[in-house]
From Swiss-Prot:
PTM annotation (N-acetylmethionine): residues: 1
Name by which UniProt lists this protein: Serine/threonine-protein kinase 4
Residues annotated as the enzyme's active site: 149 (proton acceptor)
Region (Disordered): 303-332
PANTHER family membership: STERILE20-LIKE KINASE, ISOFORM B (PTHR48012:SF2), STERILE20-LIKE KINASE, ISOFORM B-RELATED (PTHR48012)
Taxonomic lineage: Eukaryota, Metazoa, Chordata, Craniata, Vertebrata
Organism: Chlorocebus aethiops (Green monkey)
Modified sites of kind Phosphoserine: 265, 320, 410, 414
Amino acid sequence: METVQLRNPPRRQLKKLDEDSLTKQPEEVFDVLEKLGEGSYGSVYKAIHKETGQIVAIKQVPVESDLQEIIKEISIMQQCDSPHVVKYYGSYFKNTDLWIVMEYCGAGSVSDIIRLRNKTLTEDEIATILQSTLKGLEYLHFMRKIHRDIKAGNILLNTEGHAKLADFGVAGQLTDTMAKRNTVIGTPFWMAPEVIQEIGYNCVADIWSLGITAIEMAEGKPPYADIHPMRAIFMIPTNPPPTFRKPELWSDNFTDFVKQCLVKSPEQRATATQLLQHPFVKSAKGVSILRDLINEAMDVKLKRQESQQREVDQDDEENSEEDEMDSGTMVRAVGDEMGTVRVASTMTDGANTMIEHDDTLPSQLGTMVINTEDEEEEGTMKRRDETMQPAKPSFLEYFEQKEKENQINSFGKSVPGPLKNSSDWKIPQDGDYEFLKSWTVEDLQKRLLALDPMMEQEIEEIRQKYQSKRQPILDAIEAKKRRQQNF
């Protein structure tokens, strides 16, 4: 009788872990259920809080990871209290891992929902998701925080359809003495021009990324997704703002919303508060319109897991029969899965969020047709063998003009043919590439081939420079750890 009373009272909602819970071992407070995937700096697991029965997400981060980034992520989540931002409940140290306990969003990320359903989103669905996302950005920007990695993979949905901002691994805080940041952080295809150019940026950098995300939700991928990320970062600040591949397929309101987000001048770009008043967002429908696509995505995921389960069970039976033929008493172990549902530990297409993945997901999706059936190569989502990597400090000096020209001029001496002594070999100002029209195909190919080794050389120099700054910090952290151990 006593057990029933403990197990069945009305359970309160978990808001924050109390001091008593935080002093216990995490296994005493949570039951870890399964691995969901990879987030920034760590693996993410689904778990249940024993006292309340509430499902949570736990990010387990190796202590040897970048400690400053982990502390930054925790700090930003601790300060946030919004229904449109993933909640933080508390953290633990366990062996060599830091456990960060946060809100669980059962439907996963928007990008995963697109992949699971093999469909892009409708305007109504996009408007509803953008409305919640803008409320989250309005809150963050009011708190003088920049997310810096807005994309469909970092917008999570709970099972009711509410969108929440997640993955603060690269988020930054604006202070009164630092009104604009000058570091290049984010995912290249979503990055604002001013971020790439390192001319300083503020909260509206997130708005550019939101505009790219709107295109991503409509077309299945961001602009420039099919070209090398390092080439994309040249094109984003140089080219006009991107738009839809087929603008005629989209309403004037949606097209104008994206246009307001993708203004190259940050001073003229709309804020989150202003965009919440845009007709496209104001006419957004309730979250109930997202329930069908959420249920459909979750059904696909469940069927895939059941199929995997049947395959594992079948393999177990076949191996068991073989083992019985080998020996009447000894049964060999069949890996470490033992007939359980396999959950992937890898991410696809750089989603970098606390979401569930199947190993077989990319191979089973086939080709995603986007917008129209008569569109050929442009209308399909191509599978990539490599994942989109988040931008790293290797971009930090990539766009400094003098350094570029020095590298180009020195490299040009070894370039064969007409490129060798050509005055056209310098990077043109203001994106003036008209002179290329007079070149032969052979000359253009030589120029293209010359770019890659030059890029690799610059990246290596920047990497070494970054490492020389990073190493003293790592040494200082290690020294402090040793002193703490001595005490």
